[in-house]
From Swiss-Prot:
GO molecular function: rRNA binding; structural constituent of ribosome
Sequence intervals crossing the membrane: none
Gene: rplI
One Pfam family of this chain: Ribosomal_L9_N
UniProt entry tagged with the keyword RNA-binding: yes
GO terms classed as biological process: translation
This protein's name: Large ribosomal subunit protein bL9
Amino acid sequence: MQIILLEKVANLGNLGEVVKVKDGYARNFLIPSGAARRATETAVKEFEAKRIELEKAAAAKLAASQAEGEKLNGKTISITQKAGVDGRLFGSVTNHDIAEALGKAGFKVVKSQVRLPNGPLKTVGEHPVTVALHTDVVVDVNVTVVGETD
């Protein structure tokens, strides 16, 4: 299926590009999320009319993400979780827990933006985590997992 990208999509293309993707990817993800539109003749003409407006919105979104990234980069957050004597957690700290802790600290982060390269955190200590605020803005955050023993 031919689609027009309405925003930058990682590993696919930039705003305004007409790309060919699998039908399911377009119908089930890109079009419902507002990232793309079917590339019909009328849609292409409408897009060209709105192109400047969409580029301004994309630039504003990027600037907001960069400003948030400057504040967030290098921050350390602390999460308390039940742990055994050996420093292993009962359960784990997931991207949902980290996003929630960042939200309490005043940052707008959703769990899909938190990247855990080695999977959920299962030990007490300090762990580096990356947060992708935008496709072009990726920051590093330190998560300190504190074990509580009862």
